[in-house]
Design a protein with these regions (language model features):
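Conserved N-terminal segment of class I S-adenosyl-L-methionine
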Residues: 1-159, 163-167, 177-180, 250-253, ...
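S-adenosyl-L-methionine-dependent methyltransferase catalytic module, highlighting the catalytic core
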Residues: 152, 166, 174-182, 192-294
Length: 294
């Protein structure tokens, strides 16, 4: 375990307790907040070996209800096969800068939803993922070059990809600054990076925390206990700009946008309601940036 006395992003010593959760299973139980940059992070934090052990068989764990979840993903694949470029842009705004036949890298590809969109646009597909079962799943459905492990170990060449997609991964890593720097290195000049991650500055996080404090209860963790860092929008943007990336779009889903998508999704009503709640309160953010052409 790693114990932080200072904020791992800005170095400030001004930290305070933020949440604790001892009821659920996960590599972390407590979080702190940096009062300077507003980052929320696990402290103590699992080290690289502990996280690697946790992510082994990640998509087979009980909380993913593995068989049903994979069936849901396959339903998405079938639906995406019928979409054209304009429909993909409307449904997945974070891919609006993705051009057909681009060289596309999905970091932490999971079960391949991002790959499905890129494949529909006839892109050349690459993917990294820790979970071997997930990699086997995507290879069974797409012509994708895969790497099992972290982005550093893949050793991709400089200026190699037209588009990098990293959805709900940056909040799982141990060094987000270095991660963004590495993605900047392997991105072509003029290429795009799309980062999807929770938004700690959302109304739902604030409401949940203060509703607990008012009742004299210790706030618990409402997202995944495996998360290492949860970013406010302003901080995520500044981390990208510090690496020289130019932010083109930075948004959270509004209710109407996601509701129109969810009508067509084949998933249990409970999951649909959960997704709606997350998007009504702007729990998740997308940041799309590009590497300048010098």
């Amino acid at each position: 375990m790693i114990l932080y006395r200072n904020c791992p992003i800005c170095g400030s010593e001004s930290l305070r307790g933020f949440a604790i959760d001892t009821q659920r299973k996960g590599p972390h139980i407590s979080r702190v907040e940096c009062l300077k940059c507003k980052l929320v992070f696990a402290n103590p934090m699992a080290d690289s070996q502990e996280l690697a052990d946790y992510y082994t068989g990640y998509y087979e764990k009980d909380h993913y209800e593995s068989v049903d979840y994979k069936r849901l993903i396959l339903n998405h694949f079938q639906r995406i096969e019928k979409l054209d470029k304009s429909e993909i842009n409307k449904e997945a705004r974070f891919l609006s800068k993705l051009e057909q036949e681009s060289k596309f890298l999905d970091i932490g590809c999971g079960l391949g939803l991002g790959l499905a969109y890129a494949h529909q646009l006839k892109c050349e597909l690459y993917a990294t993922e820790f979970d071997l079962g997930a990699l086997e799943f995507v290879k069974n459905h797409f012509p994708v070059k895969t790497f099992q492990g972290d982005i550093w170990e893949a050793k991709y060449p400089d200026n190699h990809f037209d588009f990098i997609h990293i959805s709900h991964v940056i909040e799982h890593v141990l060094d987000p600054k270095a991660y963004i720097s590495e993605m900047m290195r392997i991105l072509k000049p003029g290429g795009y990076l799309a980062i999807g991650t929770p938004n700690i500055s959302s109304k739902l996080y604030r409401f949940h925390r203060w509703s607990k404090l008012i009742r004299m209860n210790i706030p618990d963790v409402i997202d995944g206990l495996e998360h290492t860092f949860i970013f406010p929008k302003k901080l995520l943007r500044s981390l990208c700009e510090e690496q020289g990336l130019v932010v083109d779009d930075h948004y959270t889903h509004n209710f109407g946008e996601k509701f129109s998508n969810l009508i067509h999704y084949k998933m249990p009503l409970k999951k649909k309601l959960n997704r709606l709640i997350q998007n009504v309160f702007q729990v998740n953010q997308w940041l799309i940036s590009r590497k300048p052409v010098f």
